[in-house]
Design a protein with these regions (language model features):
Chain C
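N-terminal helix-loop segment corresponding to the beta1-alpha1 unit
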Residues: 2-252, 450-473
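An anion-binding loop in the catalytic cleft
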Residues: 43, 302-303, 313-318, 374-375, ...
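Glycine-rich beta-alpha junction loops
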Residues: 86, 184-186, 260-265, 302-304, ...
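Short Gly/Pro-enriched turn/cap motifs at secondary-structure boundaries
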Residues: 109-111, 118, 282-290, 296-297, ...
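A short glycine-threonine-serine/GTX helix/turn-capping micro-motif
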Residues: 220-231, 255, 286, 293-295, ...
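Substrate-binding/catalytic subdomain of NAD(P)-dependent oxidoreductase enzymes
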Residues: 243-286, 394
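Aromatic-enriched alpha-helical interface/lid elements that frame and gate functional surfaces
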Residues: 294-384, 388
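A glycine-rich dinucleotide-binding beta-alpha-beta segment and adjacent secondary-structure elements
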Residues: 384-439
Length: 496, 161, 473
């Protein structure tokens, strides 16, 4: 395709904005390899073309839309503001086929207004109405219907009860006791709908001496509060011995609101378990509570068990893992390179690979009697020595060279990729792990659900976020039988 | 010589032959003076993107800005200097305790004083084909530890938390 | 929709409020008390298990795939972990700085322990050993498949297929079977690339947006723990439970192909769509937030425990999470730290969210905190009604009354290994009627060989012993 060329002078972001569209700067920049190429150039190398051909025939992403949906018919209500945990759980259920309705107050979830560094130019406009919305909100509302309801009004509470009487699942992410005070909490709804599975999710809990708080002015706690309260931040980041404190050598939060995602997926798992128990055994719903602080604590490896063993407080170790050698990333010529291989078989193979270019590595590492035993290699001084010499090799080569060299030795190795590189990585484009969907807000590049590759019931993305209240008509009609006149009344009263 | 300083300084008529490891995140971009862990010779180095742009140049008489974290001597069976060896290597503060063992910690009791199977060797207790029961018969298998536990209870060294 | 009422009749169910003395008590109860009673931490064992009767095979190693099966075991499924004879899961040989092990690893290895790296990834499971390579084992394996609901495996592509143990074969034996192949990359050009948690963090972009910005002196930072391994494992569990739900209707199993490296990209919020639309490549932003200000972690001048022996307390009890992004909160914050000029300069959220403004705001906060301890800072802010929270360490987590009351930190009297502090299972979520529970942490390699080979599959003990001698099991 011929590309038009023109000269552009860029003095501010404004000068480049109209060029930053997918039409002018398409994704992907280069096409992924074809199935034919992958089969003949990759799969045949290890005589796996038959098996992988069979896998591709059956689980390929492109075939997912013709298949059944695992949770078809499941009705889910999601109510909450500000955070991503409940939204991620709701998205997971919706990706598997549930009918998920997201309830916002008539003013909308404040998350709709959030945009990186306050840049309104990075918000997207609804193609019908032009209403602007932040990208994070759109991204975390997969396959969900958007309706409005003010549960602070008595009428709104009644409407909520009617919706919930019809639902299989309610996901709630309001401050502790907020729904209960309004007569729409679990203890009220369970009588209306004994089969209802009701899941609350938040930061530290809706009960207990350190439960979730609001500020004096009503501001919510948002991630990373959860990560601060379970020692996760305490042990993330570079030690002050590697980088000066205040200049990179500090406890560090994740770049994303990670506890929200971790809690969200456990909300979805617990809901599915409760659903199985309801359908298989009891016919009864139940009450679930998942917090970011605790769900993330669940997956902090052995940390607390180690404290109970000999009062160890896990220290941060930067990009090095204290349990395995090698298992780290270190700087290289054009970024950072991750290398992993702990067992003797893999560890010596890494050495053989590096030795080819840098013979001294083999001498200093493989001859050292203190590095011969797998467990002993995890001692701190062994990490310092191994990684210093590994980096001595890496500094002369870039990520792609390191990856190619190490893959030749069947070592798990990978570059630290930036977002553009992630989106252009051939493997990711091939599956595809990211792809463009045509949304209400125009072309929207999206990471695929990891459960999208299945024989029979792959999870899938059908649409992303919608404008505020877009589905009021459809959902109120289907779920509770309200017609246009009734909706108009509710709108006038400010209930929806 | 980069990323490591292989010190060849003549000391008492023979070269020092100590490898000082310059850990990558600290020294990736760095300028200053550093001592050899063995002979304490001070070197000036200027590292840019992991490459030694200048140095190592000897700076006799100067105090070093820093020290390596670890150094060893390949010609002497890899005799080594661990971190935090005073005057030779840099301390490493960011640790889970004030000391590291680097080898298995033999633990018989948890921090609240109850028995935990954290020591070796354990007496044989398996059945057929490596099967184990669902019960640690500590009284019979490790009566000494059980006795020690009773003693701890008597002394009030066992608590709920 | 509420049913049409007969206006002449007053039925008790139509009246608002409780319908019996018991319900009256329940409705009068303060909400916190109600929650506490509903979840009743510590009494999980007295309640039914959600996944009673499900049996799952865990042909797994490391953290990612084991966790996907352990989630099922926590919820009441019977999970059989199949390991390499004598050696077991590679994860058993990992321990922080080589220091913490529980003994023994295996009957024949009294001097080798299982490292704490194995913790939490395989709880409540039965431990079987089997060498799949041995032709005699294939039929035994098929026996397990016929008696089970599904399997999770992580072998290199085609490995189990070579031994006729892939879904291609197993669906013939058991059409209800649900098969999970959890790999690093899955089909595609990098299908043979191995993977680890840290590789996922690096490769999928999470590392590129975590850590201090270059101008702050930082590098791409690894999220602590094997967080992506665990989180991807839970994604599998969810896929499995959805498939089980579908199977209840259709009687048919399925195969899932799940890639661990993909998960972190899905966790990155606006990053990918922002790139797709505008070509903007999200960068690291350290301890601050790209969408809220003030909402970040600050360094205080003094430690809370300057005399502590443990360096983690002595040097690092210095960080506070501070959050005041709404206008009134930010105004209050500026007044507490004596910098009303900041409020005058940045009265709108959009203004204080600009990068330059953030730098100014957090600098001002750290200057104000320079002569204070962590707790002095958080107390001063909390007393003013602003949200602030100490960045806690593991001792503080252990001593948290909140987590103790909720049962999410508790001691386990492990049947085989004794007294273990535990932070898993209960912490994944409280459930009022069919909660998760922790029965045991792990068992030695092959600890349930007789229980499964003889008691379940009916193989004579002499045969089992013979296989054991040959190291087939």
């Amino acid at each position: 395709m011929a590309q038009e060329k023109r000269d552009v002078e860029i003095n501010s972001i404004q000068d480049s904005l109209d060029m930053l569209t997918p039409e002018i700067r398409p994704w992907p920049v280069t096409p992924p390899p074809s199935a034919e190429e992958v089969s003949t150039q990759v799969y045949t190398k290890r005589k796996a073309e038959d098996f992988l051909g069979w896998v591709e025939d059956n689980v390929k992403f492109e075939k997912s839309f013709g298949k059944a949906e695992a949770l078809a018919g499941l009705k889910v209500l999601d109510i909450g503001l500000w955070r991503l945990g409940h939204k991620f759980a709701a998205s997971m259920l919706a990706e598997a086929g549930a009918e998920v309705v997201c309830i916002e107050p008539p003013g909308g979830d404040p998350l709709r207004q959030l945009t990186p560094f306050g840049r309104e130019e990075y918000m997207l406009a609804d193609q019908e109405t032009g209403e602007k919305c932040g990208i994070e909100f759109i991204a975390e509302m997969v396959n969900q219907y958007a309706i409005t309801l003010d549960v602070d009004t008595e009428e709104g509470q009644q409407v909520f009860r009617e919706l919930a009487a019809n639902a299989d699942v309610v996901i709630e992410a309001l401050p502790p006791g907020y729904a209960d005070e309004r007569g729409i909490g679990y203890r009220h709804l369970k009588d209306l709908n004994p089969g209802l599975i009701y899941a609350w999710t938040g930061i530290r809990g809706q009960w207990g001496p350190d439960k979730d708080r609001l500020s004096k002015h009503g501001q919510w706690e948002i991630e990373p509060f959860a990560c601060a309260s379970n020692a996760w931040i305490h042990s993330t980041g570079y030690p002050q011995d590697q980088l000066p404190r205040g200049k990179g050598g500090d406890p560090t939060r994740a770049g994303v609101w990670i506890a929200d995602y971790v809690a969200g997926e456990q909300v979805a798992v617990n809901i599915m378990a409760a659903l199985y128990w309801r359908e298989e055994f009891s016919g009864e719903g139940q009450f679930i509570e998942v917090t970011g602080a605790e769900a993330l604590m669940d997956i902090t490896d052995f940390d607390m068990t180690w404290y109970g063993f000999n009062k160890s407080i896990k220290a941060r170790t930067g990009a090095w893992d204290p349990n395995l050698n090698q298992y780290e990333w270190n700087p290289c010529k054009d970024g950072y390179m991750m290398i992993g291989g702990q067992s003797d078989r893999l560890w010596y193979r890494i050495g053989m690979c590096i030795e080819r270019d840098y013979p001294q590595f083999g001498r200093l590492i493989h001859e050292d009697p203190y590095l011969k035993e797998m467990g002993a290699r995890n001692a701190l001084h062994a990490l310092i020595k191994t990684y210093t010499l590994t980096t001595r090799w890496l500094r002369d080569i870039n990520r792609v060279q390191a990856e190619e060299a190490l893959l030749e030795y069947e070592i798990a190795a990978g570059p630290v990729l930036f977002v553009d590189e992630v989106c252009e990585f051939p493997h990711f484009k091939y599956r595809p792990w990211i792809y463009n969907c045509e949304s209400d807000y125009g072309t929207f590049l999206y990471p695929t659900s990891p459960n999208a590759y299945q024989f029979d019931t792959p999870h899938r993305l059908k649409w992303v976020g919608r404008r505020l209240g877009k589905d009021n008509g459809e959902i109120y009609s289907k779920w509770v039988g309200y017609g246009p006149t009734r909706l108009a009344e509710l709108k006038t009263e400010g209930v929806i | 010589m980069c990323d490591v300083i292989w010190c060849k300084k003549e000391v008492d008529g023979s070269p020092c032959e100590t490898v000082n490891y310059l850990d990558p995140f600290c020294f990736w971009n760095w300028e200053g003076t550093i001592n050899c862990a063995e002979c304490r010779t001070v070197y000036y180095i200027h590292m840019i993107q992991g490459h030694m742009y200048k140095g190592p140049e000897e700076r006799p008489g100067e105090e070093p800005d820093t020290s390596p974290l670890y150094a060893d001597k390949p010609l002497e069976g890899y005799r080594n200097y661990m971190f935090a060896t005073e005057g030779r290597t840099r301390p490493f503060e960011c640790m889970p305790r004030s000391f590291l063992l680097g080898e298995a910690d033999m633990v018989k009791f948890s921090i609240r004083g109850k028995p935990v199977r954290g020591w070796r060797p354990q007496p044989e207790s398996a059945g057929i084909a490596g099967s184990f029961p669902y019960h640690w018969d500590i009284q019979n298998l490790s009566p000494d530890v059980w006795e020690e536990y009773q003693e701890k209870i008597r002394k009030g060294e066992v608590s709920d938390w | 929709m509420s049913k049409k009422k007969d206006p002449r009749v007053t039925r008790i169910e139509d009246l608002a409020g409780p319908k019996s003395p018991g319900e009256l008590e329940e409705m009068k109860m303060p909400y916190e008390e109600y929650c506490r009673q509903a979840f009743d931490p510590g009494n999980e064992a007295k309640k039914p298990e959600s996944l009673k009767g499900i049996r799952w095979l865990s042909c797994t190693m490391y953290i990612f795939t084991p966790h996907s099966a352990a989630n099922l075991a926590e919820l009441g499924a019977e999970v059989i972990k199949i390991e390499i004879p004598r050696m077991g899961d590679a994860m058993r040989h990992t321990s922080p700085f080589n220091e913490a092990y529980l003994y023994p690893l295996h009957e024949s290895r009294p001097m080798t322990g299982t490292g704490l790296g194995f913790t939490n990834a395989n709880i409540n499971e039965l431990y079987l050993t089997m060498d799949y390579h041995i032709p005699e084992m294939v039929d035994v394996f098929y026996g397990l498949v016929k008696m089970s609901d599904g399997l999770t495996e992580l072998y290199r592509p085609g490995t189990l297929d070579k031994w006729k143990m892939s879904y291609k074969y197993l669906q013939e034996i058991n059409p209800r079977f649900i098969y999970v192949w959890g790999g690093g990359f899955g089909y595609g050009p990098k299908v043979f690339g191995g993977s680890y948690d840290i590789l996922g963090q690096a490769h999928a972009g999470l590392a590129s947006i975590t850590g201090m910005h270059e101008y702050m002196g930082g590098h791409a930072t690894k999220c602590t723990n094997w967080v992506i391994d665990w989180a991807s494992g839970t994604i599998i569990t969810y896929g499995v439970l959805a498939a089980i739900h579908w199977r209840r209707k259709t009687g048919l199993g399925t195969m899932l192909e799940v890639s661990q490296v993909q998960t972190p990209t899905r966790f990155m919020g606006y990053s990918v769509p922002l790139y797709g639309r505008f070509g903007i490549v999200r960068q690291r932003w350290g301890n601050w937030d790209t969408q809220l200000c003030a909402h970040g972690i600050i360094l205080c001048g003094k430690s809370d425990y300057p005399d502590a022996d443990n360096p983690q307390e002595k040097f690092d009890a210095r960080y506070v999470m501070v959050s005041a992004f709404n206008d009134p909160d930010f105004q209050e914050l500026c007044s507490v730290i004596g910098r009303k000029d900041l409020w005058d300069n940045y009265p709108r959220h959009k203004q204080r969210l600009e990068a330059e403004a953030q730098i100014e705001v957090y600098d001002a906060l750290e200057q104000w905190a320079a002569d204070k301890t962590r707790t002095e800072v958080s107390d001063a802010l909390n007393n003013a009604g602003i949200l602030a929270y100490n960045v806690k360490n593991h001792r503080e987590v252990y001593e948290s009354e909140h987590l103790r009351q909720r049962g999410t930190i508790r001691w386990l009297d492990d049947p085989l290994f004794g007294d273990l502090l535990t932070h898993c299972t209960y912490s994944t979520g409280l459930m009022s009627k069919s909660p998760r529970r922790l029965k045991w942490q792990w068992r030695p390699v092959g600890a349930d060989n007789v229980k499964i080979y003889r008691d379940m599959l009916g193989i004579p003990v002499s045969q089992v012993e013979d296989w054991y001698e040959k190291a087939w099991i």
